């Protein structure tokens, strides 16, 4: 089973072909093809190769499925006996992609 570890938007993801991953918003149309070139490690046929920092010639091809927004995350901070409170909400924008091919 071959897999790859890549970096996108400051986060690292471990994927195999056919996986569906939520990445940070990329402003791409659905069915568009995307190449992810910041590949940190690739495992093919039991051989693991690491990059310094990226693997030379390795890339991951993915197809955009759709874009969306995540569930709202509420942060609430209350300072007792001070009549002071703060409430904030946050929704993450994401792009859902399907990994089609790992090229190493």
Curated annotation (Swiss-Prot):
SUPFAM superfamilies the UniProt entry points to: L21p-like (SSF141091)
Cross-referenced InterPro entries: bL21-like, bL21-like_sf, Ribosomal_bL21, Ribosomal_bL21_CS
Keywords: Ribonucleoprotein, Ribosomal protein, RNA-binding, rRNA-binding
GO cellular component: cytoplasm; ribonucleoprotein complex; ribosome
Pfam families referenced in this protein's UniProt entry, alphabetically: Ribosomal_L21p
One GO MF term attached to the UniProt entry: structural constituent of ribosome
A biological process term (GO) from this entry: translation
NCBIfam families (UniProt xref): L21
Reported function: This protein binds to 23S rRNA in the presence of protein L20.
Subunit architecture: Part of the 50S ribosomal subunit. Contacts protein L20.
Family: Belongs to the bacterial ribosomal protein bL21 family.
HAMAP family in the cross-refs: Ribosomal_bL21
Entry protein name: Large ribosomal subunit protein bL21
Source organism of this protein record: Helicobacter pylori (strain HPAG1)
């Amino acid at each position: 089973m071959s897999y790859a570890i890549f970096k996108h938007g400051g986060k690292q993801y471990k994927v195999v072909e056919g996986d569906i991953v939520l990445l940070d918003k990329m402003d791409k149309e659905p069915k568009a093809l995307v190449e992810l070139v910041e590949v940190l490690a690739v495992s093919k046929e039991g051989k693991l190769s690491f990059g310094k920092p990226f693997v030379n010639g390795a890339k991951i091809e993915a197809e955009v499925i759709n874009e969306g927004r995540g569930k709202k995350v509420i942060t609430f901070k209350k300072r007792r006996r001070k009549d002071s409170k703060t409430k904030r909400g946050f929704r993450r924008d994401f792009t859902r992609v399907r990994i089609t091919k790992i090229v190493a």
